[in-house]
Amino acid sequence: MKIFKKIASQISFFTIIPSTKATLEEVASASFISPIIIGVITALIDYSVVFVTSKFLGNLAFLLLLPTVEIIRGFHHLDGLLDFGDALMAKDYNKKIKALHDVEVGAGGIGLLLVYVSIFLTVLLSIKTLSFYSLLIAEVESRALGILLLAIMPPIEISYMGKIFHKNLNNKWKILSIIVEVVLFGNPYILISFAILLLFFYFLGYSTLKGSSGDFIGAIITLSFPIFLLIAERSCYLFFTSLFSLI
């Protein structure tokens, strides 16, 4: 029963959906399976909202995906994006660390928010269809990217959450499990993009914070979601076209 409690706790921790309460240690110990669990649930909600509203709004319903995604997450990852944006713009290391705990949003946070919204809206306005499969890929891969970086990157000294998650995830079998999730929900285009983003954010985290933190991981999940969504929509057509052309 304890394992089911840990699995259910992923839902209440990563979304606003009420579920079993658990300690941070319990959540972290089972978080390696959260990309699939949370990814499937949130993709179903994302698609349901867009599908129902598209009956009245047509393709304009795609724009509702942005607020839907953030509401389901409880704006927690978005808060991390704002904090990391401020840290990114701070000049010295101590100011970068301080920015992660500053309740006020600075120019860096607003700037990174505009980048995120611009990317998301550009993606939504550029696609002609929005499939459940693409949403599932984006949800799973963006979360797997964040969780994998928590597992392989040492946390910064002041990040309590980062320390707990890293301690519970830095295990070869759990890391392998996350990689399996990435492969299962990816095609060649997605996997190449995942590897590029993994390297980019890994070096960005080290150059900016000298490690990982909850805010940094929240920023990664937030920024990578629309990127994976676009690649999924574009690559699904290319992948299956090339696959059937070989048969």
Curated annotation (Swiss-Prot):
UniProt subcellular location: Cell membrane
Domain of life: Archaea
Cellular-component GO terms for this entry: plasma membrane
Pathway(s) it belongs to: Cofactor biosynthesis; adenosylcobalamin biosynthesis; adenosylcobalamin from cob(II)yrinate a,c-diamide: step 7/7
Cofactor: Mg(2+)
Pfam family, one: CobS
EC number: 2.7.8.26
Keywords: Cell membrane, Cobalamin biosynthesis, Magnesium, Membrane, Transferase, Transmembrane, Transmembrane helix
Keyword Membrane: yes
Chemical reaction(s) catalysed: alpha-ribazole + adenosylcob(III)inamide-GDP = adenosylcob(III)alamin + GMP + H(+); alpha-ribazole 5'-phosphate + adenosylcob(III)inamide-GDP = adenosylcob(III)alamin 5'-phosphate + GMP + H(+)
Enzyme class: transferase
Biological-process GO terms, alphabetical: cobalamin biosynthetic process
Family stated for the protein in its record: Belongs to the CobS family.
NCBIfam families, sorted: cobS
Function: Joins adenosylcobinamide-GDP and alpha-ribazole to generate adenosylcobalamin (Ado-cobalamin). Also synthesizes adenosylcobalamin 5'-phosphate from adenosylcobinamide-GDP and alpha-ribazole 5'-phosphate.
Protein name (Swiss-Prot/TrEMBL): Adenosylcobinamide-GDP ribazoletransferase
Organism of origin: Sulfurisphaera tokodaii (strain DSM 16993 / JCM 10545 / NBRC 100140 / 7) (Sulfolobus tokodaii)
Organism placement in taxonomy: Archaea, Thermoproteota, Thermoprotei, Sulfolobales, Sulfolobaceae
Gene responsible for this protein: cobS
